[in-house]
Amino acid sequence: MLGISEQGFRRLEAYKMAQLTEPAFMIPVESSNVEAFGYVDEDQTLFVDFLAKGNSAGSRYVYYEVEPEVYSQFMASPSKGSFIWTHLRDRYDYEKLR
């Protein structure tokens, strides 16, 4: 894989997916913190668009290796922001994409 680790390659693919697949990929939600989310089963990546706050633009984060069961719990959660804070933020690798 051209000197890149498998994990690095998967992250690059997730990043490209996030850049190329805008509206159809993301599912909008009614939330005070989260605008939309999307999940890719093949590499277990969860994308989350957070709402803009004040003068700050909204941001997109990607969470890596989120198991399908955890994604199902996230979808069923009445508070997406609280779920991210308590179940994802300190347990999964993540990064800000924009």
Q: What does each of the following model-derived ranges do?
A:
Residues L2-R98:
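Acidic/histidine-enriched, beta-strand-rich ligand/metal-binding domains
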